[in-house]
């Protein structure tokens, strides 16, 4: 028997012995034993009397969390590690809206301005790592990466907020205005180029979300086959590390 085969057998024996010892120890501890519970992540989670509603052709990333009273329109995309938590009030998102990776959207039941839902219109782009709390963002607006919108803040139609900005409670970005900073202040008027860039970003995300929906809907076997095909293809490339002499 080869050394590799011997270590494989020994490893299996040690692993099984450890599992047996763990189970035995838990039985001996009785009610004091801590047993890890399996946590199966679900994209959509009911809360109280409410369950999320998702429109046709919308993409919800596998590790995104949509909780409670949340309504999402058609062709919108909720990207990886985003959290939409409609537990204490409601969240409404329109059509063709992009909620990027790691964004948190919440609402309020007892905030500084009282109970407030979160409302996000059509064709809105919210950049990665943003926080939207009990705010209103009307259609065709842009929220830059890492921005924060506090309770009662409003972005009117075609309003733009620069990356890394803080829109404080109760503040309003008027239609066609471009704001930025912490706290955010008016910088300039939105240009045709700004509007054109937003349209491109929205369309790119719609197309990209369709590809991600197709890929993330595959079974584990299909995904594994895809990986194997990629590895085989890469091995034939002259610049691949496996084909380069050390």
UniProtKB/Swiss-Prot annotation:
UniProt cross-references to SUPFAM superfamilies, sorted A to Z: Trimeric LpxA-like enzymes
Domain of life: Eukaryota
Entry-linked Pfam families: Hexapep
Coiled-coil spans in chain: none
InterPro entries on file: Hexapep (IPR001451), LbH_gamma_CA-like (IPR047324), Transf_Hexapept/Carb_Anhydrase (IPR050484), Trimer_LpxA-like_sf (IPR011004)
PANTHER family: DYNACTIN SUBUNIT P25 (PTHR13061), GAMMA CARBONIC ANHYDRASE-LIKE 1, MITOCHONDRIAL-RELATED (PTHR13061:SF29)
Full protein name: Uncharacterized protein DDB_G0288155
Protein species of origin: Dictyostelium discoideum (Social amoeba)
